[in-house]
Amino acid sequence: MSAAVADGLTAEYVQLQPGPFTGQWTVVCTRTTVVQIGREDVAVVRRLRVPRRRWAVIVPLIVPAAARWNASAMRPQDVLICAPGTECFAFDPPGTRFAVLTFATSTTTSTRLARLAAECAPSGVATLRDEDAAALGEEILRLGTRGRSHAVDLGRLFRTCLMRATPRMRQVDSAVGRSQIVQRVEEFCRRHAGEPLSIAQLSSVAGVSERSLRNAFYDVYTTSPKRYLKLLQLHQVRRALRAVCGEDGTVTNVATLHGFYELGRFAGEYKALFGEAPSQTLHKARARKPSSPLGLA
């Protein structure tokens, strides 16, 4: 689904429950706005990066109470404002549905977003009026089915929602620090892919105690750092297998490059999570054209 994300956004998904990934991503482009509607049928961790010349607003459509966006529980009337060049982190339970609205930094809507984001700092969580949130959700869903012809009404409604939005209560601000801990650890793990990393080492990198590290991961991703990083490794292998060109790449080479040396155990964990053996992933990648990436990335 990452391959379907548009308007300069980049997304990474880490699947938390076993089985084939299923979901949907709909993109509607207008003159001033890109509306992207996502649905995930399995529990995932989602990491979204916003380009430097875009503002992004993430709107909950159907979001279970267990969901966490930047370590904050999101209510139906909340939206998450993501400034240009930033990242947001989410745990989405099965059945989560949301929309991402993006605006160029040169638009008048972005001017209002900048003011509201400053008021909501550092959490970025703003609260809409109940009636505004309900109307916005309905318009987004209509746009997803009717397409671009309905976008003018959505743009007007969204600007009205922004004018009447308020910052969420400050108790969510502590979530920002936990998101930063997770971000530092993830970046370190990506730079040291394939190396054995201990929880003690990761807590030192993050500058917190092991207990604080565990709490941060549970708050942001609702799972332990050890389990999350193992799943991240498996996804890195999956991406690498899908990117293999020609006959030189092998499952063994890719797996060991990412720190998996017990190949039988690795193959079992991989198949349990993704519903197919790593050799099947590699075979499909070789059969596909390089310009046609599919599925979860």
Language-model segments: what does each one mean?
Residues 219-220, 272-273, 284:
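Alpha-helical DNA-recognition elements
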Residues 1-53:
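N-terminal low-complexity or simple alpha-helical regulatory segments
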Residues 213, 217, 265-266, 270:
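Short hydrophobic/aromatic patch on the recognition helix
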Residues 50, 178, 230:
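Short, conserved glycine- and acidic-residue-centered signature motifs
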Residues 231-239:
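Alpha-helical structural segments
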Residues 227:
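Short, basic-rich loop-to-helix N-cap that marks the start of a DNA-contacting helix
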